[in-house]
Amino acid sequence: AINVLKIRGSHGLVGNDAIGGPRFLFMSTIRTQGQSYYFGDDQELLAGMEENAIGNTDVTWEKARKSNIGIDLGLFNSRVTLQADVFKEQRRDILLQRGTVASVAGFFPWSIPFANLGKVTNKGVDGLLEIKNTTSKGLFYSFRGNFTYAKNTVLENDEPAKRFSYLSGKGLALGQTLAFVADGFYQSAEEIAMSPKTFSTV
């Protein structure tokens, strides 16, 4: 018999101002000791002025829209209890330094502005199941287990177009490592000669 039944839910929008990056992102700055050039007959080396950082007055904090639905269930006078939650979080306006600005556009790498460009989604389920009882002789026992599944996906990271789709970080987990998968080791010279061409020498 069910003696506890509770359904929970929440939905909200929160901000995150701990977004990292340098201070005063809204300000453009000029560096007086910039690129150097030779001038005059004696070819004196003089430092020029250059754009040190390009400000962005539209920079704001990161935002997260979070939704959660959960259930608390107790059976047989709470001898069996279950807690389960399904959650989804959509983060947007993640602060990134632009990755699609080409160097031929006249920007130094350190002067490329920051902007709220990133989008990431997190979703998953987690739960807790507990079974407990006291025997007729006064022995108490309990078993508890939990489970969690979570998936993180990058929706937008302002990365430049990749030559091959597998090089893109979009659609993958945040910070996921990209690497080659090895099929094994060569065992003989004959095996090397019979194998397809690889990306490097052996």
Model-derived features: positions:
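Short, intrinsically disordered, charge-balanced linker/junction segments flanking boundaries
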Residues: 1, 196-202
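Extracellular/periplasmic, surface-exposed regions of secreted and cell-surface proteins
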Residues: 1-181
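Alpha-helix N-cap recognition
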Residues: 188-189, 201
